[in-house]
Amino acid sequence: MSKIQKIVFQNVSLQNGVVQAKVILSYQLFGQPVGSAPLVVVNHALTGNSQVIGENGWWQSLIGEDKIIDTKKYAVLAFNIPGNGYQDAENLIENYQDFTTYDIANLFWKGIDSFKVNQVFTVIGGSLGGAIAWEMAAIRPKAIANLIPVATSWKASDWLIGNVLIQDLILNNSKNPIHDARIHAMLLYRTPESLQEKFHIQLQNSEGLFRVESWLLHHGEKLQNRFQLSAYKLRLKTTDIFKNKNRIEIIKSINSNIHLISVDTDYFFTANEIKTAFQEIKNYNNNAFYHEIKSIHGHDAFLIEFEQLNNILKPIFN
C-alpha cells in the first residue's frame, strides 16, 4: 500500500471569504514518480478515499499494473478530501460548512502545484469526485488534457438539493445521524431492480430481518465514526462551476477533451442531465464526448460496471 503523505497549507482563503488558518491535504501516489510520466489525478467519491488500487482499492479494476490506467505507464495521484478523516483524525475539520466543491478543487490544485507540474494528463472522478473535477477544469481551463467526470454534473440539480435537505434533517435530528443518513443515501445510489436482483425479498435470519435491511444496516454501521457525512452532502449541494461567472465563457475556455460518462438508470445525476450538459458544450466546442453506462444498478454502476467503464476509457489511456 502506498504511504499516505501530507501537505500543510496555512491561511487558505475560501470561496465565502473565510480564511482557514490551517488545512491538511493528504494524498497517495501510485505508479511512476510525478514528473517522470503523464499525471493522472483520481478524485474519490462520497465515501471513498485515496486508496484507489490494491486489495481495498475502490477502483482496483481500473487502476493498477497492466490495467486501463496502467501504473507502469502513468503517475497516479489521489488526494483525500479534507474532512474525510481517512486513517487520520487530523484530517477532520470542524467548520465543514465553510468548504465548497470549489474550495476542494482549489486545494487539489495547490497540492498539484507542490509537485511543480503545470499540465495534468487526466483528471477523473465519480460522483462528488467528478464534480470536483469539473471545478478543477473551471479554475484552470488549459491545464488538463483529459477531463473525465463520471456519474456527476457541473451544477447541483433540484433533485440533488432536495435530497441534501433530507440528509441534513436526518443528520440534525436522528439519534444515530451518520448511520441513518447513510442508509437513506444507499437507496439513492441504487434502483429497485438492483435491489431485487441482489436480495430477492429473502429473509436474513429467523428474527424476520430481510436481507436488504441487513445490508442497509451494515452500511450504516460501517460508515459510522469514519466520515463527516454532513460535510460531504453540503459540498455536493454547493457544486456550480458557473457561480458568479459567465456560463458561455467558462464552457468555451475549457481546452480539455471532455468525456462525460452517465449511467442510464442513475437517479442522483440523471443521464438526461449529463446529456444536456454535453449538448450545451457541443454548441461551443468540439472537444466533448458523451458515453453512457447501461445498468440496472443506478448511480453506483460506476463502481460496479467495470467492463463497460474499461471499454469507455481504453481509447483515452492507450
Describe each region flagged by the PLM.
Residues M1-L39:
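Catalytic-loop region of hydrolases
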Residues Q28-Y86:
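N-terminal cap/lid subdomain of alpha/beta-hydrolase-fold enzymes
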Residues Y102-F121:
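Conserved acidic catalytic loop of the alpha/beta-hydrolase fold
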Residues Q119-D158:
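Conserved hydrolase catalytic core segment
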Residues A143-K222:
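Alpha/beta-hydrolase-fold enzymes
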Residues I254, L260-S262:
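Short beta-strand/loop motif that positions the catalytic acidic residue
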Residues Y267-E273:
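Conserved alpha/beta-hydrolase "acid-adjacent" motif
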